[in-house]
Regions:
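Viral RNA-dependent RNA polymerase
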Residues: 1-212
């Protein structure tokens, strides 16, 4: 049953991309046109609104985490893929996405058995983990054309960040040149799946096989 659900979600995402392609529509272009020609109740054309924005959140130890916000059209296209990737994460025994307490207990049990424990983290993964690597991994799940479109949808657009300079608010535009924007649906799930595969690959480099 779970496998059937995963396949259904995968097909839904591919159907969304095929529908857009049939009408020669790229979601980010469509969004730009919609906000450009929007009007208020008096018929006056509204000022175009940025459809990709960045927001910064200060965390402990001086760390600043950058979140990206995209438009509803992009999120709607990505939702089936988002659910599909999370269904894969849910099937991985050592993934803690859906039950962190169970994962901690599992780590304790394995550490007591082996007499040691190791932890891994990706530094600046959002910005620096190559989206090309993620496309390569995603290609094995949904095909290379769809995987490349996924990346295009996320990084082939401007993201705007407003900040105060003196007494004036200024806005700068940025593009992701290496990683991908954390905040869009499917983004975090793809990062987590890539992390799993990187750890397994590292293990295969030092010993034969994978681990659980």
């Amino acid at each position: 049953m779970a496998a059937m659900k995963m396949e259904e979600l995968r097909k839904q995402f591919l159907n969304c991309l095929q529908a857009a392609d049939a009408f020669n529509i790229q979601p980010w272009q469509c969004t730009t046109k919609v906000v450009t020609y929007a009007q208020d109740s008096y018929g006056n054309r509204l000022k175009p609104v940025a459809v990709g924005q960045l927001s910064c959140k200060e965390e402990a130890a001086g760390k600043v985490r950058v979140f990206a916000m995209v438009d509803i059209w992009t999120q709607s296209v990505l939702k089936p893929l988002h659910d599909f990737l999370f269904s894969i994460l849910k099937s991985i025994p050592n993934d803690a996405t859906f039950d962190q307490n169970a994962a901690v207990e599992r780590c304790f049990t394995k550490a007591r058995k082996s007499g040691c424990s190791f932890g891994y983290d990706l530094s600046a993964a959002t910005d620096r983990l190559p989206v090309r690597l993620q496309v390569s991994i995603l290609s094995s799940l949904i095909g290379r054309p769809a995987a490349r479109l996924w990346a295009e949808l996320l990084v082939n657009r401007d993201y705007y960040l407003s900040h105060k300079k003196g007494q004036v608010m200024e806005t700068d535009s940025f593009r992701y040149s290496v990683g991908q924007p954390m905040g869009a649906l499917s983004s975090w799930a793809m990062l987590a799946l890539t992390h799993h595969l990187l750890v397994q690959y590292a293990c295969s480099r030092v010993r034969k096989g994978t681990f659980s």
